[in-house]
Every structure is written in C-alpha cells, then in structure tokens.
Amino acid sequence: MFRSLFRPTVVVAALALGIPALASGTVMRHLKLVRSFPAADTALATSPEKITIELSEAVELTGSKLTLAKEGGAPIALAALRREPTATKVLRADVTTALSSGGYVVSWRTMSKDGHVVKGTFGFRVGAAK
C-alpha cells in the first residue's frame, strides 16, 4: 500500500519542480550587457565622443540612466540618453566635453520590456594605460 502511493507522489513532485525549472531557462532570462563603447578596462588614445551600451534585448528608455565620472571624482555631464534609432538594444549618451587623461567609471541602469531592472559599471582610461 505504501509503495503504490509513494510512486505517484514522487512523479507529481518531480513534475511540479522540474517543469518550472525547465521553463525558467527561456522565460526567466534577464537582459545583460553585451558590449560597450568604450569597452570595459580599455585605454583610448583620445576622449570618446559617446558612451554606448548594447544589451541582450530591447530596453526601455524611461527609467534608464547612464553616468560618467572620473575615478574618485564627481559625475561628468553627458548629453541626454537616447536609444540608437536602428538598434533598440543600444543606449547612447554623447560626451559633451573632451575628457582629460585618466581613469573613468561608467554606471548604467535600465529596464527590460518585462520590467526587470538591471544595472552595472565598467571603467576605461583616456591616455596612456598605467
């Protein structure tokens, strides 16, 4: 008697736990940073004209933010954040003043179409690498 009740219970439990786990591989994906310009941890010879981030899926401009700061310093003003016209996965902000030599940190925050907020940071250098 015990053995005959045990098997269906195990099968039901395995299905209940296994199906959502399999589905989460496709349903629960979150957007992530694919690439940036400047690329993380690179040194540029001259000041960049723009900062861009490319994400793994389309993003909402509302609620998105991109900030630039000199390492250990105050934020540096950027032009208004926008999506690239032909690429809904790319956010761009133009650099309005030439950056001096040194290290910089880019912080970003955005939201996917399904409402998940994702954020990150990366650094780059202008001028000779240390």
Residue ranges and their predicted role:
Residues 96-101:
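Surface-exposed, short loops/turns at beta-strand junctions within beta-sandwich domains
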Residues 51-79:
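Short, surface-exposed alpha-helix to beta-strand junction/turn motifs within ectodomains of secreted
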Residues 109-113:
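Beta-strand-rich extracellular modules
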Residues 1-12:
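Bacterial N-terminal signal peptides that target proteins for export
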Residues 22-34:
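Proline/serine/threonine-rich low-complexity linkers at boundaries of modular beta-sandwich domains
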Residues 104-106:
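A short tyrosine-centered beta-strand micro-motif
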Residues 42-46:
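Short, solvent-exposed loop/linker segments at the N-terminal edge
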Residues 50, 54-57, 115-130:
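Extended, polar beta-sheet/loop recognition surfaces of beta-rich domains
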